[in-house]
Amino acid sequence: MIVNYFFLLIILLISIVSPLSGNSISGSILASKYSSSINDFQKSADFNLKILESGIDDPAFYNDALLYLVASGNFNASFKLSKKMFDLDIRSPALGLVMIIEKISKEKINESISLVNLFEKDLPPVLVASIRGWMNLKKGKLEDSLYEFKKLSDTDLNFDLGAYYSAIAYSKFSKNEEALKIINKNNDNFKLLGKNFEILKSEIMIMNGESFKVLETLKKSISDFLNDITLKELYHKI
């Protein structure tokens, strides 16, 4: 399950950096406000795509459509749209991120790194360091990965993303004691991630041979999260 956290954390990063790109959403967001207010991002994406199909070739509408496709989870459509945007010489943080995610999903690590370098000026530093860190981790370069993640701990983010990523990095190299040291030090801060953090912590404790201790931890977590089914299933598997 730990390997799946990369994409969850990329979405987390989108939510962190999107307020930093206030001009990335055009006036079309007003016309599709109702759709997005009920979390129907696909309708908002379709709205912008229809505008483009009508002959309007404004980069802002391309960017809006791309953002809404990502928000709706329609990554295949977002990958297709990103190729068209790139060919039209449209550049934006959202485009760079989508193209990078596509290469990552296809395990094309070197191409992913090349895209990070290409879009570095368009992307927030926190995102660049995050992706480079994960790419180094994917290539088996733990120290290089930790170096990039350390940059995240030196930012003004309220959540220590660098420490969280570092804990996951250590666990992927079976250095579970190091991972738990970070988790225990930042436990209160990491709890902001809710049950996803509790699951991660439990899995690392299990890998570190602390099955009895993790049962006690999960009991409390199950109580805190009102008998969450996922946590209960994990508890009964131990």
Stretch-by-stretch model annotation:
Residues 1-3:
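N-terminal secretory signal peptides that target proteins for export/translocation
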Residues 5-16:
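Bacterial N-terminal signal peptides
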Residues 19-65, 71-80, 90-91:
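N-terminal leader/linker segments that initiate helical-solenoid repeat arrays
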Residues 22-28, 55-62, 88-97, 121-131, ...:
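Generic helix N-cap/helix-start motif at coil->alpha-helix transitions
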Residues 45-49, 75-87, 109-121, 142-154, ...:
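Alpha-helical repeat scaffolds
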Residues 91-100, 104-164, 169-172:
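Internal alpha-solenoid helical repeat scaffolds
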